[in-house]
Structure formats: structure tokens, C-alpha cells
Amino acid sequence: MKLSLLSLATLASAASLQRRSDFCGQWDTATAGDFTLYNDLWGESAGTGSQCTGVDSYSGDTIAWHTSWSWSGGSSSVKSYVNAALTFTPTQLNCISSIPTTWKWSYSGSSIVADVAYDTFLAETASGSSKYEIMVWLAALGGAGPISSTGSTIATPTIAGVNWKLYSGPNGDTTVYSFVADSTTESFSGDLNDFFTYLVDNEGVSDELYLTTLEAGTEPFTGSNAKLTVSEYSISIE
């Protein structure tokens, strides 16, 4: 079998991603195709611990990755949001037909308090500040909870075959909507655009807003010897 120079280069690139050592710096990143994997330890000063992250493989529009951590102290504070972010041109919601995604993951460790969630942002202009943050929680582990003005759900929609509790609350000037799965969902496949459509139809969110950010990762509060393994993650905007 003959391989072109491009194919050989692609294989070499994939191999280099697989061999790369984990990275542990507060703002370290790795790029894999259209994904950037962020070791975003933005809240590390709220507690004591460490977190390291690495790419396991990348092929086409699918990435596999992991992050390992131990955090203590500041039990009510998020320590990080290690995530895989898609690189794309900000796009108005009314120009998006679908956002197909698949996410398969598992967690191990002790006394884990964390979420596993998509995190997305909407703005009035392509480069403007965020008006809304939309989160989709596939898991709320150990009692982790979303931002909420009242602590109560505002709706209980069924989207992509999963039952969700919807919460809303402010984070500075940004309104946060969080869809929290009724039960831990370690294998999710659906259209993320359905969540935006729900908010447009039911919560008065404008479909003229720009989708500016698409991320998927975990927010740990506390736990020890924890490891999130993402065996498959893909997402695209159509």
C-alpha cells in the first residue's frame, strides 16, 4: 500500500499527539485539528491540589483525551474547567441548522464533587461580550450544582432523549442557563442546537445572537486521585 506525503504527515502528526506527555501548567494547551485542549486551572487559588491533562488520540473530527486531578479545600469553589474547545467562526443561531455531537466518558477517583458539561456562550456580536452562558451537564457528581437564582428548576424539558432540569441565574453581567441531566449520562449523542432552540422558543433568547464558544469538559470542586477519561468526543456546526 502506498501512502502520500500528506498521509504520512498526518500519521506522524497523530502519532506525535499520542506520544505527547501530559501538561500541568495553569494555562497549558494542546492543539489537535480543530480542537484546543485547555488545562484551564482558573480557580486553583481557591484550594490546594494539581491537575494534568493529555491528548490520547485524534482522528478527523474526533478527539480522545483525559485529565487527572486532586483538589481539596474551598469546597464550594470550582478549581478548573479542563476542556476541549472547537475552533469555529462565530455564527448567528438563526444560521445554524444543527450541531451534531457525541461524547463518551468515564470518571474514577475518590470523593469526587464535579460536573461533566458542555459550556457555550452567546453574544450580541461576533466579538462582543457574552450575554448568555448555556451549559449542558451530563453529570452532577457528589452534589455539584449549577448557578441558580433560586435553587429550583425553572423547567424540565426532554431533549435528545434525555430528561433535564433547567436552572437559571446570573454570573456577573451574563445570564447562565444550565440543563442538568436527571441521571449521569456517560454516553451522549444528539444535536446541541436543540438546547438553543428550546431557549429561543421558551425563554426569550434571541436567535440573532452569535454562538461564540463551544467547549466540553469537567469542573471539579474537590476529590482525590480523580481521572476523567474521554474515549470519544466529536462536535461540528452545520
Swiss-Prot record:
Any one biological process term the GO annotation gives: polysaccharide catabolic process
Keyword Transmembrane: no
Subcellular location: Secreted
EC number(s) per entry: 3.2.1.151
Temperature dependence: Optimum temperature is below 30 degrees Celsius. Is very stable below 35 degrees Celsius, but at 50 degrees Celsius, it loses 80 percent of its activity within 2 h.
Variation of activity with pH: Optimum pH is 3.4. Stability declines sharply below pH 2.8 and above pH 5.0.
Role played: Catalyzes endohydrolysis of 1,4-beta-D-glucosidic linkages in xyloglucan with retention of the beta-configuration of the glycosyl residues. Specific for xyloglucan and does not hydrolyze other cell wall components.
Protein's recorded name: Xyloglucan-specific endo-beta-1,4-glucanase A
Species in which this protein is naturally found: Aspergillus aculeatus
